[in-house]
Amino acid sequence: MILAGDVGGTKTRLALFDWKNERVEAQTEQVYISTDYKSFEDILSEFLNPPQPEAVEPVQGEDEALPEAQPNEPLKIDAACIGVAGPVIENRGQTTNLPWLLDGDALAKRFEIPTVRLLNDLEATAHGLLELKPAETTVLNAGTAPSHKRPIALIAAGTGLGEAILYWDGMEYRPMPSEGGHTDFAPNSDLEIDLLRHLRASYLHVSWERVLSGPGLHAIYEFLRDTKRNEPTWMAERIQVEDPAAVIAEVGLKKQADIGVQALDLFASIYGAEAGNLALKSMALSGVYLGGGIAPKLLVKLQDGSFMRAFTNKGRYKKLMSSIPVRVIVNDRAALIGAAAVAAKLAK
């Protein structure tokens, strides 16, 4: 039995697999709200030792004695792999959007697991990408597949922004994690320059993650609100009591307010530009994949051409960029599947 996990700033997903050689479905899987817990250890402890149902009181007058509850047999886990939303160095991971420090060796000792491997969450997603079925991705640009295996790029906007590259070593694809989402945001239009100026009033360093994430979509909306002065009162009221990014996405997709439409236009264009940057830096001729929770929810918007226009807008390299396949990962369990694939190898 192997344990796989995906630790994000919003949700933590854990699962047990009986994975030997090929991908299988999880035997048990649970999703937890990360901010409801003080540490990852608390979540893992609850997952491995779920609360037992209260004993049923015997009904007065019944002669038959109820059978005694049998204690659960201890679960034997051969290996574990956990994807962490943050940098992982020497099997220790600091979550970017949570005050958690995970230590793989300490987890192995506490929970009596022979091996616990921590990966950056995008590295885990990259491993998962290699296990996905065609139906678990959707095409944004068909492109032209190269005759030889070339690098693959992965970019994922969600609570934060993650980036990774997969390179072919002659035998198999090997994921290479990065923290590219924290590099400097580079505007490509007068409007984006104004956005950067607006954000610099709040942040000393404006990274791509400040605009390409759930909070980033909200930041784009606030910029438009403060400069265009076109926020409907009803929308402002909803944003105050609901998830801002979800409200903005819904309003923009349904075209219920101009500011929502404009926010999604700007977000999709910036997303395409940075995905194109990553493709060029890695020469990802075998494809660029969009992971994370935002792309599937904005799929209709990403398919309207604004994303690919920004993606291919690289001057003399426009023709090359147009040849790169681009797909959206629509399976939200890709990181978990990738962690399971790694754990299965560790268990052998």
Q: What is each stretch, according to the model?
A:
Residues 139-142, 147-209, 299-302, 306-312, ...:
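Glycine-rich phosphate-binding loop of actin/hexokinase-like ATP-binding domains
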Residues 51-54, 71-118, 123-136, 154, ...:
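Short beta-strand-loop/turn "lid" adjacent to the catalytic site in phosphate-handling enzymes
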Residues 133-143, 344-347:
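Short, electropositive alpha-helical surface patch
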Residues 82-86, 157-159, 285-294:
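Glycine-rich beta-strand-to-loop/alpha-helix junction loops that act as flexible
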Residues 12, 87-89, 160-164, 219, ...:
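Short, acidic Gly/Pro/Ser/Thr-rich loop/turn segments
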Residues 1-54, 69-76, 194-348:
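ATP-binding/phosphotransfer module of carbohydrate and carboxylate kinases, centering on a glycine-rich
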